[in-house]
């Protein structure tokens, strides 16, 4: 197995000249197929995982970035050369609420304090979910906090805020929500989720320039093939990866197993249905960011299925 190289962004320039450089936030579950593919399946020269995400593509030494679709769209505003080339995982986000706060339905969240990470996919999730119940911004209060991925969770983290009743509910990525369930007990919480209203589309990104460079594109295609092998394990033989994934992000395996099924591992669809979904989310993002929404033509250009198509051809 290939050794996995984990470096900070500041170390990018010292990486080998031929290394494929992939940027992702290494704290979250969503990135783990990237790390696993590098260590176990990538057949290119070398690959290096560095801290970052889609925004790291502004550094020309970075070939690929991994992030939620929310950050992809936000970065596309000023970087029309960015391309979404693959889906790593689609995640059904959950909102956990304290029943003792009088919450049994989404409508009961009116006037409540809801924890989330502003400016992220989690905030989009909260807005879309509550909008489906007829609640608009101003009818509830958003509270920032810290994400805890492994118990015990300290002061200021969402699970602790929920337990102390400084917030009534929160929604963010896993395993943080599951820890909120455990903090209060399953019988004392209510869970809300709806993938048809919001799901995180954690994706792989590159730039138009990288994809037009034959040597770089070849490495990227090889990496997508490695990801496809990883997805197969994550979907069909998760028992083989639970321990490794838990170690990568510092979470307990029993908690990880409870949230695994809310993660639909790639490759996902890069067709018109994805563009439909991005167009739907873009209506909210453009209004929230005070800018003009992307046209459907611009969103269609943003999604580039050709790398995945190349990866599916015999090597």
Task: Report each predicted region and the residues it spans.
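Fungal secretory targeting signals
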Residues: 1-19
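Short, glycine-/small- and polar/acidic-enriched structural segments
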Residues: 20-158, 168-174, 189-198
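Short glycine-centered helix-capping/turn motifs at secondary-structure transition points
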Residues: 39-41, 60, 165, 283, ...
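Pocket-lining segment of extracytoplasmic ligand-binding domains
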Residues: 69-70, 145-248
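Short polybasic/polar patches that bind polyanions
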Residues: 76, 131, 182, 247, ...
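Secondary-structure end/capping motifs
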Residues: 213-293
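Conserved C-terminal helix/tail region of periplasmic/extracytoplasmic solute-binding proteins
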Residues: 285-315
């Amino acid at each position: 197995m290939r050794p996995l190289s984990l470096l900070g962004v500041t170390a990018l320039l010292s990486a080998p000249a031929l290394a494929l450089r992939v940027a992702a936030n290494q704290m979250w579950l969503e990135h783990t197929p990237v790390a696993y593919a590098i260590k176990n399946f990538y057949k290119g020269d070398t690959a290096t995982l560095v801290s970052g995400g889609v925004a790291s593509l502004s550094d020309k030494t970075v070939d690929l970035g991994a992030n939620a679709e929310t950050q992809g769209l936000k970065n596309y505003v000023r970087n029309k050369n960015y391309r979404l080339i693959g889906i790593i995982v689609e995640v059904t986000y959950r909102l956990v609420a304290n029943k003792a706060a009088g919450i049994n339905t989404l409508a009961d969240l009116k006037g409540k304090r809801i924890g989330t990470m502003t400016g992220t996919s989690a905030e989009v999730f909260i807005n879309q979910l509550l909008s489906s119940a007829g609640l608009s911004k101003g009818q509830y209060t958003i509270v920032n906090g810290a994400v805890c991925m492994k118990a015990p969770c300290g002061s200021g983290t969402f699970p602790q805020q929920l337990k102390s009743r400084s917030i009534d509910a929160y929604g963010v990525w896993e395993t943080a929500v599951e820890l909120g369930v455990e903090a209060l007990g399953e019988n004392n919480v209510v869970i809300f989720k709806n993938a048809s209203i919001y799901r995180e589309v954690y994706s792989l990104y590159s730039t138009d320039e990288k994809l037009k460079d034959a040597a770089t594109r070849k490495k990227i295609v090889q990496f997508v093939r490695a990801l496809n092998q990883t997805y197969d394990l994550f979907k069909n033989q998760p028992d083989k990866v639970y321990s490794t994934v838990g170690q990568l992000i510092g979470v307990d395996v029993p908690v990880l197993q409870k949230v695994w099924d809310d993660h639909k591992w790639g490759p996902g669809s890069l067709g018109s249905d994805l563009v439909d979904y991005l167009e739907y989310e873009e209506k909210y993002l453009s209004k929230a960011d005070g800018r003009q929404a992307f046209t459907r033509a611009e969103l269609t250009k943003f999604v580039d299925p050709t790398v995945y198509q190349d990866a599916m051809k015999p090597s």
